[in-house]
Amino acid sequence: MADYLLNALQWIDGLGTWAAIAFMLLYTVATVVFLPGSILTLGAGVVFGVILGSIYVFIGATLGATAAFLVGRYLARGWVAKKIAGNQKFKAIDEAVGKEGLKIVILTRLSPVFPFNLLNYAYGITNVSLKDYVIGSLGMIPGTIMYVYIGSLAGSLATLGTATNQANPTLQWTIRIVGFIATVAVTIYVTKIARKALNEAILTSEVDE
């Protein structure tokens, strides 16, 4: 699959003024169908440079993530709802995410632990609003810039794999530390609001009884 994506990047590189649009469309589709976005992100650095590459990756990733979110919400939600019917814990967590969705989306976008493509569909079956979900995509910016920058160091698509060895170690460690902090933060935060939501759900059910 990596070879196909590299060939696609080579083709895009020769499109001239249409290259940006073709790249963003490819990235959008890749996000929806679970293709490895890392290759495209690194390749953007070679084809477009750091600034434009980062912009095009962000737009393509956001469009793809939004499309996957909508598919998860309107096409897969019914099936998932049947699977978790009667599960009070999921309902409580779902409601909690709906209340604090923006913060959670931003933190999970900053963290490298959460799989990007799968997470897009997972958010679709929660109560997080589309607005908060899209705004939360801003959390992708630091990682996007880093990987596009690393890709730009390769100089050509043929040597793309060697770019990671040339990257500034300080930059790499900075992004890793930010990602680690975000991972810890989102874990603690989700646990906290989930526990609060569960307690509220339990109290409500007791009052109803």
UniProtKB/Swiss-Prot annotation:
Domain of life, source organism: Bacteria
Name of the protein in question: TVP38/TMEM64 family membrane protein slr0305
Organism ancestry: Bacteria, Bacillati, Cyanobacteriota, Cyanophyceae, Synechococcales
Family: Belongs to the TVP38/TMEM64 family.
Protein species of origin: Synechocystis sp. (strain ATCC 27184 / PCC 6803 / Kazusa)
Keyword Transmembrane applies: yes
Main localisation: membrane
Keyword terms, alphabetized: Cell membrane, Membrane, Transmembrane, Transmembrane helix
Subcellular location field: Cell membrane
InterPro entries, alphabetized: TMEM64, VTT_dom
Any Pfam family: VTT_dom
UniProt topology in membrane: Multi-pass membrane protein
Ranges that cross the membrane: 15-35, 39-59, 110-130, 134-154, 171-191
GO cellular component terms given for this protein: plasma membrane
